[in-house]
Structures are given as structure tokens and as C-alpha cells.
């Protein structure tokens, strides 16, 4: 059986050009006015507590 050929490993990681790695998705933040209105319809006290917590 022939000897195994050992090739030197590159020190820097192999990357494709233009590939900067993972990034956060561009997702718009929810509209807080509509959120508070929906919460008021469901549970007015919970909406009031949320408003106090979030500083609204």
C-alpha cells in the first residue's frame, strides 16, 4: 500500500470573494401604536403595564 500524502493546511480560512459571513436579516420593527391598541382590546390592564414597562 502506498504512503499517505500529507499536504500542508492553509493558515487563513478559505472564503469566497464577497462572502462576509452571516448577518442579521433586515426585518422591520412592529408598529407599537397598533400593538398597544390590540393589547387594549384584549386586556386593558396588560396594555397599561406594558406601556409602563416600555416607557411609552
From Swiss-Prot:
<feature type="region of interest" description="Disordered">
    <location>
        <begin position="1"/>
        <end position="56"/>
    </location>
</feature>
<keyword id="KW-1017">Isopeptide bond</keyword>
<dbReference type="Pfam" id="PF20513">
    <property type="entry name" value="UBact"/>
</dbReference>
<keyword id="KW-0833">Ubl conjugation pathway</keyword>
<dbReference type="GO" id="GO:0031386">
    <property type="term" value="F:protein tag activity"/>
</dbReference>
<protein>
    <recommendedName>
        <fullName>Prokaryotic ubiquitin-like protein UBact</fullName>
    </recommendedName>
</protein>
<comment type="function">
    <text>May function as a protein modifier covalently attached to lysine residues of substrate proteins. This may serve to target the modified proteins for degradation by proteasomes.</text>
</comment>
<feature type="cross-link" description="Isoglutamyl lysine isopeptide (Glu-Lys) (interchain with K-? in acceptor proteins)">
    <location>
        <position position="56"/>
    </location>
</feature>
<comment type="similarity">
    <text>Belongs to the ubiquitin-like protein UBact family.</text>
</comment>
<dbReference type="InterPro" id="IPR037543">
    <property type="entry name" value="UBact"/>
</dbReference>
<feature type="compositionally biased region" description="Basic and acidic residues">
    <location>
        <begin position="30"/>
        <end position="46"/>
    </location>
</feature>
